[in-house]
């Protein structure tokens, strides 16, 4: 098992101590030095798995005359090891530091800190020395791993968007000069991936750039990824736990450099008989799950492309090398999560200095732990797609897009949730820190401590929350789950209509949500994600007749100014009633078909034009009914 910590956003280094460093914008990276001697000291990190190996990575701009050194220490049996040097960068040159004397507890083997016993905690630090120009630190990463469970068989292959082959131009290390050809599998693989990202460099140039000036070798994992990171790419060493994680990278259009080891006859069709360590590029998967690669050990360009049997490749990579990979890509397209109780999604990268209930720039709100995809960085802002709030754009479904402040995001891995906050606001206790979480926030409940529930957080810490504030995910839609939708919507009764509002946590308790935000939160509590705005909610819903309506189903109204566009949604409460966040009245309220349209539900048909009497001057609108509650896939 392995786990990788990626430190690329301000929240990722929460709790660290810095000296002589100045935080910089998210677009630029993490810090820049502001004195001749600087230090970054991480907090003590408790790993989610016991580990016996640790590998570090960094991306930085290190001017000539400056240096950067990464060190780590681990705790074994309540004893801290000394600090071990994982690598040094002096200007554009790299230096390894093999342990002079093997510690009783651990030692450095090229690029890996190896432990003689398992550890659960580690700490790392970066030491900087600077002359006139500052060093800019863009990224840090640490991978911890153990050999537990490596021998299990891989999961059966399931076809998906990873059944594809990325167009990675082939290179053969065997065509390089004799002094390189047998030792540059890593630089050759790196060259293929850099070329894929429109950074064409000759293999020999890459080899000299990543060469370890201590051992004169070319294959130090940390140095190879550090070099790639100097081209404004996100680049780090990781270990993936199975091929399914590689498949996700391929599906997103990102080739993966992988390390393999095998004995004679163990990897059919390989250009070399055996190897203790060799790097190649995974470019895709076949229909039956076999692995498509560009293997730089091939004797010529035409034979670089290979297809390796899935089972044999899995052994050579995951079992023999613990799934080691280089993950290299632009920042755009990477996944992250929201690390604050609520984040405002804006149409432009401008801060919300003052709350305006009808601010047209305010698009939506995201809750703690929600998954996002990064699209663009601009200063201290990042354009994202909200993966749990779908939108129908350019003919297909994708995350709702907008700008949030980078201080709100984290690259931590969110534990798989099994519970959800069911009250409007709930206090989460993490040591001396308190977080005010919104209804709809999803959490991983680990167990109970009296009247409190213990939950796992993305930064691998735990916290406590009142058990009565949580609800387990439903695994079926029934009368109880439908009633829970109504109960959740009722939490907002009497609050003000808030354009883009989608959270129980607002600057003032009187501030509520917009119509589709109310629906989104009510459905999240039963574990169902639906699109963000009313138009998309109607588009993806299952149409219903008026006689088919059940509690919790939805009612849609067209825009009076554009009858082809849906602009309002309400939640059916049974009988003749519904609950809504009504813009014309400025609040979340109950109403009825008879009151609003002059006729009861029984006399109003799907797609009929009705008169909306909620306006001072009644308006004509089309009305529709829809459901997500019986035939839609449900979140497990």
Question: For each of these PLM feature ranges, what is it?
Answer:
Residues 200-330:
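Conserved active-site-adjacent core of cysteine acyl-enzyme catalytic domains
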Residues 330-343, 354-357, 368-371, 378, ...:
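Boundary regions of SH3-family modules and the immediately adjacent low-complexity/disordered segments
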Residues 10, 127-218, 270:
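Active-site-adjacent structural segments surrounding the nucleophilic cysteine of cysteine proteases
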Residues 220-274, 278, 528-595:
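...with weaker cross-activation on analogous glycine-rich loops/strands in unrelated enzymes
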Residues 280, 291-331, 417-418, 430, ...:
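Aromatic- and glycine-rich peptidoglycan recognition patches
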Residues 164-174, 429, 441-447, 451-546, ...:
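N-terminal capping segments
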Residues 4-17, 37-55, 59-144:
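Beta-sandwich interaction modules
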Residues 7-26, 48-49, 90-93, 114-158, ...:
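Noncatalytic regulatory segments and standalone regulatory/sensor domains
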